[in-house]
Design a protein with these regions (language model features):
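Catalytic domains of lipid- and phosphate-ester/thioester hydrolases
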Residues: 1-219
Length: 219
């Protein structure tokens, strides 16, 4: 593997932060299991097929399956892969924590995609391509443990920390050239990718109120 600018970026980040993140992923397993720190789930996007690569110090294979408690027969696709299972032979838990952060935040064009030692080789990029605010992961976790949550907690609060407003004004489109008329529709779809995610996640959030009986609030 070549030492590209992403590798240099990670090393510089560790130097600037006093090497506080130069730990192995598995070093966080015990603090998480003892509730000393929050549970972390990272989900960079696999460039090859668009699925999400779920990374956590804890086993999280339950997040890669769609639990169906009804008799409705539907053949679903699996859109998540568990990192620790896929790279079990490569001792996945020994990956550097700062490398996990870099994979999760590899924004297109800013940093090159991260290549991983699978067969065939897969590349991953920013988690925001599929789930920019983590709502998809959070709702799946909530759905998996909803019965335990209903019996053992007083409710659920989602805290959404954003860098932009959810509602954006419609931009006025000036008169365009012939080439711009061809390229603008595709460019607008790409530019509104996060807005489309907001629409889908708001819908999922509303549906969650139907299958969770505990108090449920969003901040």
């Amino acid at each position: 593997y070549s030492k590209d600018r992403a590798y240099a970026f990670e090393n510089q980040l560790n130097e600037n932060t006093g090497s506080v993140m130069v730990k192995r992923l598995q070093d966080y397993r015990k603090p998480e299991s003892e509730a000393m720190i929050p549970m972390m789930v990272f989900a960079p996007t696999i460039v090859n097929d668009g699925r999400r690569l779920l990374i956590s110090p804890q086993p999280i294979s339950y997040l890669t399956t769609h639990r169906n408690d009804s008799n409705f027969n539907f053949k679903t696709t699996y859109d998540e892969v568990e990192f620790s299972d896929l790279f079990r032979e490569q001792q996945a838990g020994n990956i550097r924590f700062s490398s996990v952060l870099r994979m999760n935040a590899t924004f297109p064009y800013i940093l090159p995609a991260v290549s991983l030692p699978s067969e065939p080789m897969i590349q991953v990029m920013d988690a925001g391509i599929r789930d920019n605010t983590g709502m998809k992961t959070s709702l799946r976790f909530l759905h998996t443990f909803r019965k335990w949550i209903e019996e053992n907690t007083s409710g659920v609060i989602f805290v959404d920390i954003r860098d932009s407003h959810k509602e954006r004004p419609i931009e006025e489109q000036p008169r365009k050239t012939f080439i711009e008329n061809i390229t603008t529709p595709l460019g607008n779809i790409y530019g509104n990718l996060l807005t489309i995610q907001d629409y889908n996640q708001d819908e999922s959030y509303e549906y969650a109120k139907a299958w969770l009986t505990s108090p449920f609030d969003f901040i």
